[in-house]
Every structure is written in structure tokens, then in C-alpha cells.
Swiss-Prot record:
Substrate binds at T10, K42, M74, R88. Pathway: Cofactor biosynthesis; coenzyme A biosynthesis; CoA from (R)-pantothenate: step 4/5. Keywords: ATP-binding, Coenzyme A biosynthesis, Cytoplasm, Magnesium, Nucleotide-binding, Nucleotidyltransferase, Transferase. Its EC number is 2.7.7.3. This is Phosphopantetheine adenylyltransferase. It comes from Serratia proteamaculans (strain 568). Homohexamer.
Length: 161
């Protein structure tokens, strides 16, 4: 039986913390879908197509990782992809309450859907896309936190605003 997992998120932009988790998930599962949510309510800086393209570049070395965009409920997307495992990252205890609510709702919507929680490597445990964007907007050095292609894209996007 193929172990197919989905690692969902907005990935606006994809950080080294995200890359750490998808890389580790790719070692645990036969096939991993990096599922990029449209998330219009979050007002992402990058379009869905841009986020999919960047994530595809960043994960191109991971043979068992596929990058897809989606705009439906995660449980419905998982069912359409024949996946029954969700990979989620937990950076801090504060993430747990929200993730527990999501896991329970997803299980209610799709009883066979299990959530697996991974903690990022310590060096990435404080990184979030929102924090990186804020540092970039104020001229801080974000290169240590993002893949190089994402760093360049973020500076280009901010310069165009």
C-alpha cells in the first residue's frame, strides 16, 4: 500500500522551515503532495500560481514530492487525491491548540484522515512566512531563512509594490 501524505499550507512564501518539513515528510511517506492553499482571506503577497511555481523549484530535488494548488476544503482535497495522511508542523505549544481543532474538524469531515505532527529542526523553529515578510519590508536580512530563489522573488515582489 502506498503511503500518500499531504502537507498543506499557504506557503506565502515558502521558508526553510517548510522545506525542512517537506524534506523529512518525503523520507517518511511514499508520495507527498505539497498542497498550496489559495487562502484569499489571508491576502497572500504571492499569487497561487507564483507560490506553486516557487515551491516546485524549491522541491524539484525531491522525487516523491508533487506541488499542487487547491481552493477547496482540505478534507475534500485529500479525498480527491486518495490521501489519508496530513502532515502539519508545530513550532510552539501555541500552534498545538489550533492544529488540534483543525485535525478534529478534518477527521469529522473525513474519518480516515489522520494528522501527523512534525516539529521543525531547532534552527527553523521560530520562522514563519509572516515574520520573514515583515523583516524583509523593513530591510532586514532574510536570506538565512528562505531558499535563494524565494529570497529573490520576495525582494522583487516587495520592490514592485
Amino acid at each position: 500500500m502506498t503511503r500518500k501524505a499531504i502537507y498543506p499550507g499557504t506557503f506565502d512564501p515558502m521558508t526553510n522551515g517548510h522545506l525542512d518539513l517537506v524534506t523529512r515528510a518525503s523520507l517518511m511517506f511514499d508520495h507527498v503532495i505539497l498542497a498550496i492553499a489559495a487562502s484569499p482571506s489571508k491576502k497572500p503577497l504571492f499569487t497561487l500560481d507564483e507560490r506553486v511555481a516557487l515551491a516546485s523549484q524549491v522541491t524539484s530535488h525531491l522525487d516523491n514530492v508533487e506541488v499542487l494548488g487547491f481552493s477547496e476544503l482540505m478534507a475534500h482535497f485529500a479525498a480527491h487525491q486518495n490521501a489519508n495522511i496530513l502532515v502539519r508542523g508545530l513550532r510552539a505549544v501555541s500552534d498545538f491548540e489550533y492544529e488540534l481543532q483543525l485535525a478534529n474538524m478534518n477527521r469529522h469531515l473525513m474519518p480516515t484522515l489522520e494528522s501527523v505532527f512534525l516539529m521543525p529542526s531547532e534552527e527553523w523553529s521560530f520562522i514563519s512566512s509572516s515574520l520573514v515578510k515583515e523583516v524583509a519590508r523593513h530591510g532586514g536580512d532574510i536570506a538565512p531563512f528562505l531558499p535563494a530563489v524565494v529570497t529573490q522573488a520576495l525582494f522583487e515582489k516587495l520592490a514592485a509594490q
